[in-house]
Amino acid sequence: MDQPSVAIVTPIFNRIGNLDRFLAAIKSIDYQNYRVVIVDDGSTDGSSEYLRANHPDVVLLRGNGQLWWTGSTNLGIQWALENRFDYVLTYNDDQVCSPDLLLELTGHAKKYPDAVLSPLIYYMYEPKRILSGGIRLDANTGETSGVGNEKTDVVVPSPYEVDGVPGYAMLIPVAVLRNAGPFDNARFPQIYMELEFCLRARRHGFRCLIVPTTSVWNDREDKIDDPVRSANPIRRFKWYVSSPKSHLHFGQNMRLAHLLYHQVHGRLHLLPALRFVLRYLCKTLALSLMSKRYARRLKKRLGFNLDRWA
């Protein structure tokens, strides 16, 4: 039986150390009709030169350094559409996959031609702990939650529907791209682009499914060292108010809340964004108070100045 063609689109930027590992996993999959499309958005570590010398079989596209994840992925999608591929698989360079990834995803895509699909995503450092099993969202508040996140090796026998699938390994039929369009680079250049895309695809009559019978393992850092989840409120407060990544998340979350209200109710309204800003300010105030109390307790207990401690 003929296999449908799949373009595996991977954006990269200055992570030359990931290339051999991720390409070795891709090249070991039990599938023949695919091409790897790597979009290098201005790397300065020799990634493009390394790929040309060591992996000449991949399609290498170059960005201008301003594309981020979304623009880079859209460039790869454009190449796939121009070359008449049946599916696009968005795929990150910091992960590996099971050999049956494309067989499972394309097999279920034939059963569910109206769906965008994703495998279960696990942590690479803890291979049975789920990083993402799909996305649920509250259309009134814009808040999102994970399905099965942080659980251990939850096995579901058949695909299940979610509000959005993660962009780590998202199989998109070209019919979805032609009807709903590519990712929104203008409003979501780096985060939440997959959720916005899934919402738009659902408005055009498509579904989002998780295929739990195949897996990807992502190299995301251990959350023990994550300042967002640190037991030290001083560290969390400093990250929350000063980190550029926190500011990016704040802006994108506010846009997402605004967008969700518009998509659900058919009109624009400032209430969701204002509600999100209020929650942000309350959380910042709470972390500030927690930090001060935490510092006073430690200072009293340990007997030294903690003003500069974090």
Task: Give the positions of each predicted feature.
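Conserved donor NDP-sugar-binding/catalytic core segment of glycosyltransferases
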Residues: 96-138
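A short, conserved alpha-helix in the catalytic core of glycosyltransferases
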Residues: 164, 169-172, 176-181, 187-214
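A conserved acidic beta->alpha catalytic loop
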Residues: 40-49
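A recurrent flexible, glycine/aromatic-enriched loop bordering the glycosyltransferase active site
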Residues: 152-172, 240-243
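Non-catalytic, C-terminal membrane-associated alpha-helical segments of glycosyltransferases
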Residues: 230-310
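Glycine-rich, basic loop-to-helix element that forms the pyrophosphate-binding segment
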Residues: 63-83
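Short, acidic, metal-binding catalytic loop of nucleotide-sugar glycosyltransferases
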Residues: 24-33
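Short beta-strand-to-loop acidic/aromatic patch adjacent to the donor-nucleotide binding site
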Residues: 85-96
